[in-house]
Amino acid sequence: MLLVCLCIVMVSSAEKNNTSYGDKGWISKAVNTDATIPVLPLPQYFHEEREQLSFSIQQMPEWKGLQTDAKARLLFHWKKVAEINFNTLKNANKVTSSFQVGILGKDKEFDKLVAEKASQWINKISDQGYILLLNGQQKIIAATTEIGLFYGIQTLKQLVHAGWNKAITIADWPAFEHRQIYDDISRGPISTVDYIKKQIERMAEIKINFLSFYIEHVIQPLSHPDFAPANGKLTIPEVKELSAYAAKFYMQLVGSFQSFGHFANILSVPQYASLGATSTLISPTNPKANKFLEDVIGEMCDAFNAPYFNVDCDETFDLGQGTTKALVDSLGVATVYANHLKFLHDVIKHHGKTMMMTGDFPIDHEEVLDMLPKDIIYLTWEYGDQSSYEKWMQPFASRHLHYMVCPGILNTYRMFPDMVMAKNNIRGFTQAGAKENAEGVITMIWDDGGAYLFSGDWYGVYVTAESSWNTDSTAHASFDKRYEVNSYGTHNGNYVNALFALMKLRDVPITYDLNFRLWQQKLLPAKGKELIINNVSANDALKIIAEAEKYIAAAKPSMNASDIHTLSFAIKQYRIMIESRLKIVAIADDYKKIYSSNRSSSESITLLKNDEKIIADLTKRYESLRAEFKQAWLNENQQYWLDVVLEPFDKKISGLNELQKNLKEAEDNLHDKKSITTASSIGLGIRESSGFYFQNWMLTGPFPVSDKKTFPSFLYSDTKEYNKPPSPGDFTKYDGKLYRWRKFASEDGGIIDLHEYYPEPSPAFVYAYCYIKSDTTLTAKAFASSNETMEIFCNGEKVSGNTKTADANTTIEVNLSFKKGINNILLKIKKDKADDCTFTFHLQDDLQITNHKHKYQLNPKTKSYDAE
């Protein structure tokens, strides 16, 4: 039997102002200052009184105005509070009165008790709000609905867990009725059913009330069971199970399915290829494609328990291509888009749900907003730290349409999510949305790149929970403290300190923007090949890593330890990457010195032995990290994509093993007075450079040469429609054939091996594009190399023609005139050789350069971080 025990000690006002409870560092202060309590989200109103309390929850509460089934549902969560152990005050008088938990308006005596302390709040708490009274006379949780009582119990749970010992009055309600997390499970990590249940439990405690998933192909409907990956999917019965589980925690699961673009995964399955207008876009006019969408969306609508369904339909880059070209040419892109969305709207409405859709296309084509049904909810997304979010709200707010703001947590092509950007974006977009009557907040977690763990995202999830419940910026100062006590049961600040120490790597050139290019780059070149390594800022990075290590080692969580393990892993991963680069360069230098001097002395043998040991130690560290990551992945995710994310580990381990074997062979040759082979021949073709080589480009082609001896005369396309600087996914046209511009990142430190990317038979033309943003007008020296003929263009002007160098070490120098703003760089390369075609490009060393993908910035006055 549960028993409530309350102990009360009266303290003077002067004593109160200097008293912390439970030695946890929570200082009692007046309301409307920087006062705080260990609750997240921070309540809208709270006020401490003079009583100091010690209480435990061991008795069933007195239920007021609740049906039997509602009592049973809430009792499940009440018992979770009762299970918490905490310290009570010594020498306190014991009081055994019970908590009263009830619905307002059902019991006059209960209403009167609540009104004595909180009459001014009763009409403000809304459907999801609650009132919590905790003092010597009253132990009350009151609300107008069952879900409000649930949220009141969650607040009590957090107070109890933190060892709260003050009399307090809380009146609380959400700023937004709809507070959702949207988790990407289609780019690699797809959570297990058990882990999703843990997500539900933890999110519900912080008053998140909707969970959804970004789904392209990882759902297995009964009508079409053959497109989902065998080892990574959610089945319809599993979704129903999860919906029922979410309902126990007063949450709902929102169905989501990409219903226009981003369809490549399904269309790549042979039996579904005919449904595509292009390789990435499902046909909006094919009856079989429409039937497919009706089937899949229908099953999903019935399985997900929320009253909404999100059809996505963002980034429809191919609309107007393939089989949609004639239709778009005839009707216009907005009409074709709107017609497909109206079809989807009818499907959703048939299943009794409200349609959600992304807002990027309507922002670019506002006329579509006047073509679509008015009950659609638009999800307008922007993930950057912007000074204003008006651009992303105005098209919807000005028309009084239903819309929700969608900030983001971006793992996207990063080593760890950028929590500086995420925190500012979530807070800024949410506050802007509150002012412009947005109806909800949906934080979208993106995993492009695929090698991520959700346990690295929780800080951003808690920022979402707080910002969507309470938009008051005065709560920001205490957020980190409340986050730690509620996530980890700690008061030392060390997780947050470690997290934001690691975030300092955003500013260091070698780790700029937390880009995962550092991890994807080859550790060692192939035999006979070369790898460029720039270690100029390596020691700066190591200092930051050491700071983060110090904090994470002292975190000492009492719960949710996987968050700490994931951050700790990221720190270890950064350390081994930086140290590997330094050690490999040193070993390559050792070997080159031995080779050039042809020394067979004992000193050379000793040097090689030492280098072999260094390689062996590195190998063991990579093997250990691989095992650690694999276990962490399987703790959260299904088997799907694990082989892909382990591949960089395996390549590094294999390369190190091969190098150790080659070094041992060289050692034996020296011992036997034999000659040794070149560094390049054993995989040590390392070139250390202080230059910033451009590693990220957009490529298109290969265009067949046939009888053409000279480069095509056009810049970007031989048709006016496409002859413009490209964005990812754009097309170019050559001799009547379409080619797509694709993102490319060098794994060789800036040596772009076109034969690896385009192994098609030569000869052919390949185009490479990037842009360079400059804050001022300037002229800079550029250095380029290519073992094939190359032309260089800057802002449409040819600055070098028919250039060819002996190898990547030999460069030609050209002057580039940069205007203020965006400068377009285009390289045209003629790929003649069947097995070898490379180029490099860099600017003079005294220029400070940063980049995000193919977008480069010169001498930035302020650092910018791209939200992609």
Language model segments and positions:
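Acidic, contiguous N-terminal accessory segments
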Residues: 13-147, 151, 155, 159-171, ...
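Feature activates predominantly on carbohydrate-active enzymes
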Residues: 48, 123-336, 342-343, 347-356, ...
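Beta-strand-rich ligand-recognition modules
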Residues: 793-841
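Aromatic-lined ligand-binding clefts that engage carbohydrates, nucleic acids, or primary amines
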Residues: 774, 778-792, 825
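Extracellular and analogous surface-interaction loops
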Residues: 768-780, 815-820
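Bacterial N-terminal signal peptides
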Residues: 1-9
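Accessory carbohydrate-binding/adhesion or oligomerization-edge regions at the termini
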Residues: 15-38, 658, 662-751, 828-868
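Substrate-binding groove of N-acetylhexosamine-processing glycoside hydrolases
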Residues: 28, 32-49, 54-55, 64-67, ...
